[in-house]
């Protein structure tokens, strides 16, 4: 990871790193001794919530960490040394989504995974990938809203494309050839794009699952 001229190098569990980076697309993560590092040495103990939609990852106490704090349309990073760097939210979105995509591509190219028989481990595994896909899709949707670019999403084995034209946002399913229009998104985003945090949070909370 590079922050300004500072490069942080470490060996860690990149799948856990990618998920926690996806979490920080909409949430702050502040360094704390009782929380997992952003690049954990090991991050394989997965604790699922009750409805298997989110996961808390526990690892050993060695790794690399920093704070990620949202400030309007910017993101501020605070390193353990006290060094601070600021980037635009859009830049951060691109970097995080690209990293997560690379990790998932590598994972998918590996041998098929066996779902754990143990219920606790199985729930953790299922919740991990549910949260990953939800946060990845939602991140792409928000980026599409902000840039107007077409974004490709996947959900339950189907492929979707989110785009906008003439002030209307559309969701196209490649398999069913169905198109849905959501004109209300445009008006909501036009109010949120100038930094109104409350409205921006409303946009961020329009999840991919909500509209299907």
Predicted regions span which residues?
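Mixed-charge, glycine-accented linear interaction segment located at domain edges/termini
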Residues: 71-131
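Intrinsically disordered, low-complexity regulatory segments enriched in Ser/Thr/Pro
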Residues: 3-4, 64-87, 167-188
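Amphipathic, interaction-prone secondary-structure segments
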Residues: 1, 12-15, 35-62, 145-174
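Cysteine-centric segments in proteins
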Residues: 130-142, 170-171, 186-212
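Short, mixed charged/polar active-site loops
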Residues: 6-8, 84, 159
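Acidic, aromatic-enriched beta-alpha/helix-loop junctions
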Residues: 9-34, 166-201
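Short glycine-rich, low-complexity/disordered patches
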Residues: 30-45, 106-131, 150-159, 205, ...
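Negatively charged, low-complexity tracts enriched in Asp/Glu with abundant Ser/Thr
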Residues: 6-43, 130-152
């Amino acid at each position: 990871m590079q922050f300004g001229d500072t490069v942080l190098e470490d060996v860690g569990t990149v799948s856990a790193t990618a998920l926690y980076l996806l979490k920080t697309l909409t949430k702050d993560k502040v360094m704390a001794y009782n929380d997992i590092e952003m690049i954990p040495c090991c991050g394989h103990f997965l604790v699922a919530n009750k409805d298997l939609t989110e996961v808390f990852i526990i690892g050993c106490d060695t790794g690399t960490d920093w704070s990620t704090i949202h400030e309007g349309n910017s993101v501020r990073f605070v390193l353990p040394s006290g060094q601070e760097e600021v980037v635009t939210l859009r830049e951060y979105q691109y970097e995080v989504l690209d990293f997560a995509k690379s990790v998932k591509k590598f994972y998918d190219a590996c041998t098929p995974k066996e779902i754990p028989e143990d219920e606790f481990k199985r729930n953790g595994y299922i919740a991990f990938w549910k949260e990953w896909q939800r946060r990845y899709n939602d991140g792409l949707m928000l980026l599409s809203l902000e840039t107007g670019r077409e974004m490709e999403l996947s959900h339950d084995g189907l492929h979707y494309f989110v785009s906008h034209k003439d002030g209307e946002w559309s969701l196209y399913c490649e398999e069913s050839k169905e198109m849905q229009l959501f004109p209300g998104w445009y008006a909501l985003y036009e109010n949120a794009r100038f930094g109104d945090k409350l409205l921006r949070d409303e946009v961020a909370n329009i999840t991919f699952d909500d509209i299907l």
